[in-house]
């Protein structure tokens, strides 16, 4: 019984990473850019129908909804070899095509105007699935469409489908270089409020670190968007392998999320991946045993979120899920886990068990790989709060001077006052406090004092 997942791609960033994700899925399942199963793809043990459905003529169509308020990226997808892959009815471009101008308020209020058209598409897609498990939303939090329209959709999805899971892949802005979006801290904070309140699970893709990894580890001088998006699609496809190549564990989304998120608000996950290579043809001369892979996943340099050093707080893991792909002997897994615990290679919360789960998954038979074993770590770690602290600091600087607020005042939500900004700041501040509380043994009773 497949539990289907509908992917929603929003804005420039969401559609670009979504495009790479579908390219990767097609390659892994032996599906051509037109959606036709390749001649050599005869192994019937994968589950294509979690992410695809079949048209009348048997070709595969992604369960994806592509939304944007300006046409550039979606047009480039429609002019690519993968143009015929998508269902044209699932592509929504706003009439006037002016975009949201990197303004959260504009994206949000356009969402209010066009939500009926968008939900017609989403409802049709949901009705077409046997037992829909949830939605995956790809977007960035710094721009206008991904953040504003994304926030609006998150709120509405909760109202419309209260029992369905909502997982997001959220791209956080690059802090190493100057942003061309001056209101980025406002956009990010307003979106973070929705990610805290309306999503079940947020996979944080931090552009700062992705750029550093591309430069330092993959030795790319000036990484392009395309190369960064390939890294992202690797993470996205690896995090869904257990759904597509089902084993006896973690073969649905709730199984993945449940082991990682013991308390509902602390649902921001970071990822790590090893071994990282861009060039498939270069076989890296490294031994990849399960222990090597698991040990490397715990090294900070493989983790794809840049967290600041915090001397006051003893940050720790709340839970870890390692998805290991390749030729693995299950007894090795047990030994590796024991060794990680004995050597205390990971520092865990004081109020619960040291939860390291391992999901074994097959590799796609159709893709050549230079490594016997590769691994993805999805970790719930309290230091992710430093990312939110950084956003709050930048927000406070702008808010104190009331900088750039006139762009927001044009929209209905900010006509009267800026309460929405201040409540968002409050929500994110509480989230940071809760992450700090989770590093202390008395966290279990912390919630009770708050109520």
UniProtKB/Swiss-Prot annotation:
Keywords: Cytoplasm, Cytoskeleton, GTP-binding, Microtubule, Nucleotide-binding, Phosphoprotein. It comes from the Eukaryota. The modification Phosphoserine is found at residue 131. Gene3D superfamilies: Helix hairpin bin, Tubulin/FtsZ, C-terminal domain, Tubulin/FtsZ, GTPase domain. Tubulin is the major constituent of microtubules, protein filaments consisting of alpha- and beta-tubulin heterodimers. Gamma-tubulin is a key component of the gamma-tubulin ring complex (gTuRC) which mediates microtubule nucleation. The gTuRC regulates the minus-end nucleation of alpha-beta tubulin heterodimers that grow into microtubule protafilaments, a critical step in centrosome duplication and spindle formation. Component of the gamma-tubulin ring complex (gTuRC) consisting of TUBGCP2, TUBGCP3, TUBGCP4, TUBGCP5 and TUBGCP6 and gamma-tubulin TUBG1 or TUBG2. TUBGCP2, TUBGCP3, TUBGCP4, TUBGCP5 and TUBGCP6 assemble in a 5:5:2:1:1 stoichiometry; each is associated with a gamma-tubulin, thereby arranging 14 gamma-tubulins in a helical manner. Gamma-tubulin at the first position is blocked by TUBGCP3 at the last position, allowing 13 protafilaments to grow into a microtubule. Belongs to the tubulin family. This is Tubulin gamma-1 chain.
């Amino acid at each position: 019984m497949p539990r289907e997942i509908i992917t929603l791609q929003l804005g420039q960033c969401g559609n670009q990473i979504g495009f790479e994700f579908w390219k990767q899925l097609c390659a892994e399942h032996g599906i051509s850019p037109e959606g036709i199963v390749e001649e050599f793809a005869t192994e019937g043990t994968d589950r294509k129908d979690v992410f695809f459905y079949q048209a009348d003529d048997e070709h595969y169509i992604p369960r994806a909804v592509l939304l944007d308020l300006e046409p550039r990226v979606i047009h480039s997808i429609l002019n690519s070899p993968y143009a015929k892959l998508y269902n044209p009815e699932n592509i929504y471009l706003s009439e006037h095509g002016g975009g949201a101008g990197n303004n959260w308020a504009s994206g949000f209020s356009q969402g209010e105007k066009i939500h009926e058209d968008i939900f017609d598409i989403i409802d049709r897609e949901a009705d077409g699935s046997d037992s829909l498990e949830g939605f995956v939303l790809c977007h960035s939090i710094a721009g206008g469409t991904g953040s504003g329209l994304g926030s609006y959709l998150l709120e509405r999805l909760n109202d419309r489908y209260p029992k369905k899971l909502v997982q997001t892949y959220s791209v956080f802005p690059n802090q190493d270089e100057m942003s061309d979006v001056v209101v980025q801290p406002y956009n990010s904070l307003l979106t973070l409020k929705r990610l805290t309140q309306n999503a079940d699970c947020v996979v944080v893709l931090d552009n700062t670190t992705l750029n550093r990894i591309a430069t330092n580890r993959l030795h790319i001088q000036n990484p392009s968007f395309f190369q960064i998006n390939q890294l992202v699609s690797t993470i996205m496809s690896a995090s869904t392998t257990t759904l597509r190549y089902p084993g006896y564990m973690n073969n649905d989304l709730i199984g993945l999320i449940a082991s990682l998120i013991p308390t509902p608000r602390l649902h921001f996950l970071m990822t790590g991946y090893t071994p990282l290579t861009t060039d498939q043809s270069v076989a890296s001369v490294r031994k990849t045993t399960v222990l090597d892979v698991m040990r490397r996943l715990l090294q900070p340099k493989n983790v794809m979120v840049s967290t600041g050093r915090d001397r006051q707080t003893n940050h720790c893991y709340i839970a870890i899920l390692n998805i290991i792909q390749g030729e693995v002997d299950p007894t090795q897994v047990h030994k590796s886990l024991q060794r990680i615990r004995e050597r205390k290679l990971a520092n865990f919360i004081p109020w619960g068990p040291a939860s390291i789960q391992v999901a074994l998954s097959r590799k796609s038979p159709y893709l050549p790989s230079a490594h016997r074993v590769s691994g993805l770590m999805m970790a719930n770690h309290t230091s992710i709060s430093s990312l939110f602290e950084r956003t709050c600091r930048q927000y406070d600087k702008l808010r104190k001077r009331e900088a750039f607020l006139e762009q927001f005042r044009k929209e209905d939500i900010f006509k009267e006052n800026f309460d929405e900004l201040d409540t968002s700041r409050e929500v994110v501040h509480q989230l940071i406090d809760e992450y700090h509380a989770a590093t202390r043994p008395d966290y279990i009773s912390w919630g009770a004092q708050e109520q």
